[in-house]
């Protein structure tokens, strides 16, 4: 993640493109360049703090010592903590730890949605201010009471906040047994054993504390004389992540060793729960920094098999480990199989993996245009989503170099970097960032990225958390130009959040499918609702939901309203 760019092996673009002839299903993914295929300009509008009321700012505690955690946080989340149907916002901050003593009190922030485009800080009343050097957040209803709970990852000790259902939370970390000591990063709620309860996977980064801090620099470079740089994570030892099984009584059991997680120590950042082989058991794709990425395939709830190497997602070209940070999963080419994406450091290119239906993947970053667009970028949070509701899956990425001294060395790599927006015309991805308005020209220290429709207009909005800076709230304008139906799924036999559900929908000549994944991005958590875009078509013919195991229910819903959210409950035949 923190190495200085140099001469790296690069995929020969023309050779890669020619290789698509062997895979006809790649042809329609090739970089689209027709300006007529591009969506309207200015798809997102920045909502300034003066308008939103979100005045909180992230403080990294940056020091001349260059302690590694300073450059990596933090995350953000959309969640409806009070169950009023409107997405609230949670932001994670740094705090006191063995290497950082803040000059003033620092805290995380929970902002309640006022339903008018503004937010009110309710952190103190809710009791979710944190208490350490925060990293990320994951929202999920682990006890099935209908209110989202909140897991906050930290350097040192993480926190589980149980939602009391009255606007307040209780720290139940010790009782639940999920403190996950060490340096935790991303986390995800998902039901790995299909017992109907959400379990918890927590990524762990390197073996680090103040006593293990190294002074790293480049004494041979005059521009860095006497200065420390953030160390390359390669010098730190990898650590195994955690898997906690939900016992159904408010407690969890650490099953990391039993399930094969501890067999694979890593330097893990992002995680997404998905189903890469369509067997109905949720798998995990984990981004690792300077060691191979993990693809933990769930062998029917009995054990996870790590197949990153054999699947083709563990390494970059030439068999080299890259600096994986953010991840996501979606059925990009609509063949019924979930694809994968990972962001990396500059000069490594981001990884875009198309599922070959046999537990192997092809990296199509070259022919899709991703490699060319990301050569000089360092990516963190990202999400696949249909931002303009035309029925095609687009891609948004937050970027920013982790080393704030990089500009003293290189002319073409910057510390702060702009967002990247790729529009899917149905024929491929087009990088439309430069023509998408001022916000996409702004350099920022992007880290977390969360999706959520905060104004309930069906156009999914975006929250970006920036390192040592204010967050960025983006209102989606483009999505309002097309028709949509939003789904709120409630499981009964399956997990209440319905993580793992498969949704298929038909509108005239348009047929699409998606999956409700768990997690994704970097240190962040998202609106649990799903928005189905259908473009200019005026009617949704039907929506089919295949509920996750242990449910065996498959339901088809018709006579659907347009341009509004509806509630679908497992086993109940009518939408609400």
Question: What are the language-model segments listed below?
Answer:
Residues 1-9, 19-22, 33-34:
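N-terminal secretory signal peptides
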Residues 9-18, 119, 169, 252, ...:
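N-terminal export leaders
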Residues 40, 50-51, 61-62, 369-372, ...:
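Gly/Ser/Thr/Pro-enriched helix-cap/hinge segments flanking short amphipathic alpha-helices
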Residues 43-57, 61-64, 68, 120-132, ...:
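Short loop/turn motifs that recur once per blade in beta-propeller domains
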Residues 73-83, 134-144, 184-194, 198, ...:
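Beta-propeller blade termini
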Residues 89-93, 149-154, 200-204, 284-288, ...:
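Hydrophobic beta-strand segments that make up the repeating blades of beta-propeller
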Residues 93-103, 207-235, 398-414:
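Short, conserved, GDST-rich strand-edge loop motifs in beta-rich repeat architectures
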């Amino acid at each position: 993640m923190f190495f200085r760019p140099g001469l790296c092996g690069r995929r020969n673009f023309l050779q890669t493109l020619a290789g698509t002839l062997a895979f006809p299903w790649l042809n329609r993914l090739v970089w689209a360049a027709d300006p007529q295929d591009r969506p309207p300009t200015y798809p997102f509008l920045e909502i300034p703090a003066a308008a939103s009321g979100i005045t909180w700012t992230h403080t990294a505690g940056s020091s001349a010592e260059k302690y590694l955690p300073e450059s990596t946080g933090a995350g953000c989340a959309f969640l409806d903590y009070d169950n009023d149907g409107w997405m609230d916002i949670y932001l994670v901050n740094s705090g006191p730890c063995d290497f950082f003593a803040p000059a003033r009190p620092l805290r995380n922030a929970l902002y309640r949605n006022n339903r008018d485009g503004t937010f009110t800080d309710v952190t103190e009343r809710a009791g979710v201010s944190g208490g350490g050097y925060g990293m990320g957040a994951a929202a999920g209803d682990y006890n099935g009471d209908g209110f989202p709970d909140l897991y906050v990852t930290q350097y040192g000790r993480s926190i589980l906040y149980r939602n009391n259902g009255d606007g307040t939370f209780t720290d139940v970390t010790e009782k639940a047994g999920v403190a996950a000591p060490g340096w935790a990063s991303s986390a995800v709620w998902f039901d790995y054993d299909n017992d109907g309860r959400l379990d918890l996977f927590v990524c762990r980064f390197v073996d680090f504390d103040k006593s293990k801090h190294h002074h790293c620099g480049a004494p041979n470079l005059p521009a860095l004389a006497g200065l420390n740089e953030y160390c390359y994570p390669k010098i730190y030892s990898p650590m195994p992540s955690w898997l906690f099984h939900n016992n159904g009584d408010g407690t969890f059991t650490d099953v990391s060793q039993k399930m094969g997680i501890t067999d694979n120590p890593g330097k893990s950042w992002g995680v997404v729960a998905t189903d890469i082989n369509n067997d109905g058991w949720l798998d995990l794709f984990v981004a690792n920094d300077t060691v191979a990425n993990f693809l933990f395939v769930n062998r029917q709830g009995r054990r996870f098999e790590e197949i990153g190497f054999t699947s083709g997602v563990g390494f970059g070209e030439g068999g080299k480990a890259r600096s994986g940070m953010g991840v996501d999963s979606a059925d990009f080419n609509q063949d019924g199989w979930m694809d994968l994406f990972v962001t990396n450091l500059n000069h490594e290119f981001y990884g875009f993996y198309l599922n070959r239906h046999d537990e192997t993947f092809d990296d199509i970053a070259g022919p899709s245009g991703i490699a060319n667009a990301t050569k000089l970028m360092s990516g963190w949070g990202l999400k696949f989503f249909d931002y303009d509701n035309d029925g095609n899956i687009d891609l948004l990425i937050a970027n920013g170099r982790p080393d704030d001294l990089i500009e003293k060395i290189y002319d073409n790599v910057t510390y702060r970097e702009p967002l990247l927006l790729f529009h899917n015309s149905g024929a491929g991805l087009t990088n439309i960032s430069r023509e998408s308005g001022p916000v996409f020209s702004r350099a920022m220290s992007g880290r977390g990225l969360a999706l959520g429709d905060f104004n309930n207009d069906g156009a999914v909005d975006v929250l970006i958390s920036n390192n040592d800076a204010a967050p960025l709230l983006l209102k989606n304008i483009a999505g309002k130009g097309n028709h949509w139906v939003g789904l709120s799924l409630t499981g009964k036999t399956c997990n209440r959040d319905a993580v793992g559900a498969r949704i298929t929908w038909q509108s005239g000549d348009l047929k699409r499918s998606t999956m409700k994944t768990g997690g994704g991005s970097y240190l962040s958590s998202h609106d649990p609702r799903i928005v189905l875009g259908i473009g200019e078509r005026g009617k949704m013919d039907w929506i089919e939901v295949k509920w996750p195991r242990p449910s065996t229910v498959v339901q088809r819903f018709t006579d659907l309203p347009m341009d509004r959210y509806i509630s679908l409950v497992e086993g109940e035949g009518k939408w609400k």
